[in-house]
Amino acid sequence: MRGAAVFGLAVTAGCAGTDRSAKPGPAASGGAAAGGPPAARALKPSAYRLQPMAGNGQQRAPRLRPRVRRKPILRMDGQDRAMVLTFDDGPDPRYTPGILHTLRRHDVRAMFFVCGEMAVDNKDLLREMADDGHLIGNHTWTHPLLPKISRSAMREEIERTCQVVEDAVGEPPAWFRAPYGAWNRNAFQLGAELGMEPLAWTVDTLDWTEPGARTIIRRVRAGAAPGVVVLSHDAGGDRSQSVDALRTYLPELLDSGYRITVPSAHGI
């Protein structure tokens, strides 16, 4: 996925798809911005989730819809040696808890692009992600090849997943990732229409091939650089190697001066 936009922009209204009359903005490529702060240990309710309203509290202001992009965001600007770890296809109760435990142990945040068919029966893991300050992204319901399905089917895949996430954590996703990294115009338009930015990756661990923890670690080491987005998986097969590899490469990255972070919740 060469030539994709640089990561880092406002986190905008997630899955604002109930207003289907609104039209997406003009096509554009992404600009650079800083990543978010390092993780804070669990605060309840978490900053990711909607805060409870007091009796006279003001309602949350609607967030702006993102513009339609022609390419997915590929990386962030790398300020302060920032990197992003992302995990796709979950949550899976066999592997996601181990990943969450390692992230919590090192007090860092990551992004989880969840599939609705996995999330619907594992909402407790979504809440755990949110409570720990991780960002939850939309990875469709059944992980289809988006260019091969109709626009209406694509909308249903994305909207259903948005709803599951919002039901679980009180706020819909603001980020979307196409399965297999296969994007088309409909995917970009619907993602923006539903309030999400498209995020790809820079470093693919290929952990889904089950190459062994040592190989996964070696690929992360080789690809580590300021601004990169690392792709791994926490479901979709035996992901024990991914869990084991994270225990080794995460502290190595931190010891090397990398700041493992997530996109800023503020605009550029």
Set out the residue ranges of the language-model regions:
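Catalytic domains of cell-wall/extracellular-matrix polysaccharide-remodeling enzymes
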Residues: 98, 120, 144-259, 263-268
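Structural preference for beta-strand elements that scaffold enzyme active sites
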Residues: 84, 111, 135-137, 175, ...
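N-terminal carbohydrate-binding/catalytic regions of secreted carbohydrate-active enzymes
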Residues: 90-102, 109-117, 123
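Active-site glycine-centered loops adjacent to acidic/histidine catalytic or metal-binding residues
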Residues: 88, 139, 179
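Short, surface-exposed connector motifs at secondary-structure boundaries
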Residues: 81-82, 106-111, 168-174
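N-terminal pre-catalytic segment of deacetylase/amide-hydrolase enzymes
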Residues: 2-85, 92-105, 248-251, 256-268
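Acidic (Asp/Glu)-rich catalytic clusters
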Residues: 99-105, 119-137, 192, 219-223
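Histidine-centered active-site/metal-ligand motif
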Residues: 134, 139, 143, 233
